[in-house]
Amino acid sequence: MAAMQPAAQLQFQNLMSPSGPSLPQPTPIHQEKVAKLCPQLQHDFYPSEELAVLPSQEVPRLRAVVESQAFRNILVDEMDMMVSRAATVIQASWKGYRLRQKLISQMTAAKAIQEAWRRFSTRRLMHSNRLTVKKAKREDEEDIPYHQPQQVRFHAPEDQPPVMVTKETQFPSFDNLVPSQATAGPCASRVPGGGLHPQYVINRLTVPKYQPCMLTKTFRSSCLMRHLEGDSLKIRHVASKTIKVGALEAAATGRYGQAMHGSLKTQTQAHTESDVPKAPLRIYPVNKTHTKVCPMAAAVPESSATMSTAPRSAPQARPTSPATVMKMQATTSPTSPVIRLPAPVGPNSSLSNTTPQMQVRYMMPGARIQPPGSAVASTIKALPHFGAPVMKVPLQTGPGFTMTKTSLQMRPMTRSQAQTYTVSTSSKTSPSSPTVKPSPQTRLAAMLTKTPAQLRSVAAVFRTLCGGTTEAVASSPRCSPQSPVVAGNTPSQVHLNSTRTKVTVSTKQATTVVKVNSQSYLGRCGSQGNLDTIVPKPPATYPLEVEKMKSCPARSPKKEAALKTNTTIAARALSWTKMMEDRSKALTQIKQRAEIIKVHFRVYMPEEIPVTLTQAQLAVPLTKSSSQIQPPPCHARTQPTSPFCKAVSQSCMPSGLAHGTPEGQRPPVGLSASLSSSPLAAHLMSLTAQLQPACEQARSVSRDHLTRSCPASASLQARSSGTIVPPEVYPNTYSPTSAPQHHMASLLAKSSSQLHPPAEHAKTMNTKTTKAACQVCPSTKLSKAPSLAQLITCLAKVPSQAQLATETAKCLLAAHPTTDHRSKTQSQTFLSSSKASVQLWQHLGTLSTGSRAKPDDRSVAQPQLHSHAPNKTMQNPRSVVTDSQGMLIPLMTPSGHPVCNAESWGDSGRAQTPPPSPVPNQAVPCHDDLAASVASLCADLVAMLGSPEDLRTLLVKTLSQGEVRTALSQALSREVLGPSVVKALPQGMLGMALMKALSWGELGISLSRALSRGELRPELNKATQGKLAEVLCKALTEEERATLSQALCQGELGAVFTQSLAQMAQRTGTFLPKATSKTVGSRMTTAPAPVEVTCSGSLSVAWGPAMGPVGARCSKGPVDAGLASGQSWNSKVPNVSVRATAHAGAPQGVWYPSRGHKPWDPIGAEAELDRKPSAELLMSVQGMEKVVVQAVVTIQACARGYLVRRTVKVWHQWATIIQATWRGYRVRRNLERLFRATTIIQAAWRGYCIRRARARQVLLPIAWPEHSGRTKGTLDNRNSSEHRCFLSCQPDVCSVCQSLGPPVESPPSVVMLVGSQPRTCHVCGHTLSTRVVQGFGQGISGQPVSRWASASQQNTLLSQQHRACTIIQAAWKGYRTRRQLSQKQSAAKMVQAVWRGHYTRSCLTTDALLGTGGPWSISRDTSRHSSRAYSLHWPGV
């Protein structure tokens, strides 16, 4: 590199020459100058801008120089040199450090060796001196056969008596117990006060008092060792030498003291702990200096003599004073009192005070920190926090449990705010959600679906039967939008809707109330305010009612959906299973119903909505919804009302009307008065009263709510009028319902003539209310048709009210359809503003409701009407009309808002004027009108027959009452029917239909047939959907209406009816004549399907098996009444209307299985009716239900048992795993503890063994060879034989003399000179001077052979072992050091290489290469010029 530097300089000079002085000539860069160059260059270049910015013409050449390979090579070489030099310096430093460390260690070792050698030499010299002295003594006393007792210490000067030492205070020691005068001087001179007088040493040796233990023994051994070793030092000459070594020993002792504090923790600490507390060491003020140096109080004096390798630690531990020990422990173990932190080491100490401190220590930390306590407290606190949220959650679910208490339906009844707001919400949403709530049949089907195949087959049948209902429910969402209007007023509706039980209960109560309530009761009811009051628990109702209640509560999918669904459920909630359950649980459910009703009242309290509907409108919605609505307050009551218009209204009236009729609904005074004479009047009054309260409730309660309550109480009314009512109440929402509208239309048409005066009132109310349009439509219809009062009167007079109702419905339909059918939108928005739509709904509702509800109403309501007002004039048709009218009037009244509603039947007469006989007002309807009415009746019958469950429910409920039974018997009698009706419909037809509907066997057959013909339903629907509308539209003209009025007045309804049937048959060109004739008589007309309102608003008559779920086809919203077989009247509340019909027919009965309506072909209707069911099909549904329930229970039990067993099995598995894990952990923990204990024990035992072996080695007598040459017994051997007393004789005497002396190999451990006296041997006769000594203890056993050889061999072996250990340790340490050094060197090389590369790369920058500073010293100001440099000099960079 040195050679290359000049070249580099030359190259730079040559390259830079053009620039002249502008650029300073770079100087060779050496590593040692780099640091200096950087600042210098910076100072030189950067101050001047002209230098900083190179001329542009010179930049290319400079750049070429910088980029040249030679220049880069130079830079790299320079850098390598610098880095190499740095590495060399680092390595040299490291090596020097290592060498110094090694030298220090070697010097320390040398010093230690020297000290050890000095000690060894000193001991040897002392031994040699002692032997010399002993030899001199023996020579002086050769005449005495004296076996040298080494344990007796004689004073050097013989004139001094020997110092007697007791066994308690002295171990075997040297002969001389007192240092010679000569040694005292040096000792004092070298280490003043450093020597420890023998007395002190003796007094300090109190180890024998210690309790024997392994550690104590070890200490004894160590102490003994020190004594044995120290004995050699305590000869005359030892004192001085001990002092000489004193300084060094003091240092050594200091080190050992430190070791005591440090390393002694392991072994010495344990010894110290065990010994110190047991033996209070006496610390004498002998060596204060040494005490300072080493915590051992008197360790120094002896340590100087006893620095042998083996006993080093033991001696230190032995002499430690308690204070020192405490210090040591404090240092070594945190358990010492000084240490505050409780350390696990502390417990190891055996000091009594240390352990207590340990305990206290632990307790104190616990008190201070309180980790466990704090943790516990915090945990406890946290737990409550967690718990609180948990508790809150249940509270949140409170509404749920409230529900559970009362039942699903009752849940919304809770008085909490939730009900209120929920009601409103649900009422709003209920329109869309009504379909959510599955009907009881659907639930049963779902339940069965989970059961075996047989049950699933049954479930399929049920689902098929319920199909219509389901469809209705599906279509109901469209209509539901209207319900929100009321929903706002009735927040609790949603809750009621959500609770099926409520609806069911209402139905049941209604049924019960039906008996109790009378027309007068309805009259009594002043306003819907009664709804608010809690209805008294209704008497036990029929099992069907109970079943409905039960079935309804089963599910509450959504509060919103619940309203519609509940209503629908109320209608079809009665499933066979539920019927069975109801029968068995009738009483219980009645009680529940009463309770639920109470709750409902509260819930429905908000039903009173400012929305004012025309009485007519209210009558309709209230007919349906008043039953429903009133039941909401008292669901059970109202719902029964709708099934039996009269009974239902009465029942509703007891609960709701008792409180008072709503303002809109005026008590049907006039109407009741006019109708009081006839059962129809009574029915109408009761219905009116019910409808009025219902209307008010409808206002307040969401339409869905009304629908719910209505299904049970006013299912028929709901279908006929109730279905339309919702549209009227909620014209916008409800109008879409075509089927309900058709029913409503039919009902309204039929009852419009009767309700015409109410209609007028309705008009007035409509004008008053926002829904005047609805009222206007009814008013228009009513104006065309005879007044309600007149119609009622006519009906009372006319033999067949059913026909009249049909005709009236036709007339009203004819009048209204023109207006209503014109706009489907208006019909859909019935409530909103379209009078025509209201009328259309009424018409449609009348038609569809009539078609559906009429069959039930006629069969059921007629008997009721007759029973209430036993008027034989009211024939089966009339009774049907009464029911239909009850429903129709409400339907019409809805159009005429509250006026018609309140006065539609009973109120129309009261509020406005008792309806005079409508004969003059109503023109006798023409044959076409009659045919249309018959067709509507047929449609109603078909609808009712399509849902035999509803029909049977109605029949069961009505037939259970005496009045209804009477009315039915009258209807079946020729006198009531009349010759014309008999001709049209054979007398036995109705009875046969009733019997079939009422017989489970027939019902099963009908269901099976309906199912088998399920494929025909859609086709028939399609084929006949538009026929009924056409027929009805064409049938009722003004002339026909006049003819109908005349026939009603003159009692010629029979002839007119027959003619109208013929005309209708001709017009329709279908099987209507046959089916109609049969259907009209039996009220079970199969041919006419319920009228369906299309989007256009035109009525489409679905002929054919309308009874079956014809497939609700709501063009926009309303479901065809034909769908009524299982569908709701209103498309908005299709389920509700269907349910309403079903419940109206049997609100209390559970006829859910029959929900799927039979599609009776008009042609085959007769055959079906006449045909007897086979024995197999006559199997009791109850039995079937029992079997199903039993199977379901069994399956559930099996499934639950399996689940429980599986869960238990899983738990067992988990428990097994946990137990195994825990047991394994415990075993491992115990094993670990055992290992630890074993290790400790082994270590302790090995240490003890080693220390014992070493102590023995040290205690072995070091026999020095005899120099006198005599072999008599010159060897000073000690043998392990106890001597109480022995006589030492001269060795060369006889054997007896020798035997008297102690054997050579067993001298005593301690001897005391008792005295000397001449003694004569009795064998040899020699008299010898003898010394009597007393020996104590036991010496070390030895071999009779010479000890010097063995001692020397052992010493040699020990030294060799030490040397070998030293060599091995040195080799290992050297290897380890070299390996670590090599690793560090490799790491350093790697780091250096990486750093070189990084540094080189970082330095090879534009500024470094072209800048003013050195290549690796970038100026601090580079940032200022970097951008400029890059931009100017290195545009490409």
From Swiss-Prot:
Expressed in testis, in elongating spermatids (at protein level). Residues 422-440 have a biased composition (Low complexity). Residues 861-878 have a biased composition (Polar residues). Keywords: Developmental protein, Repeat. Pfam families: IQ. Essential for spermiogenesis and fertilization. May be required for manchette assembly in elongating spermatids. This is IQ domain-containing protein N. It comes from Mus musculus. The lineage of its organism: Eukaryota, Metazoa, Chordata, Craniata, Vertebrata.
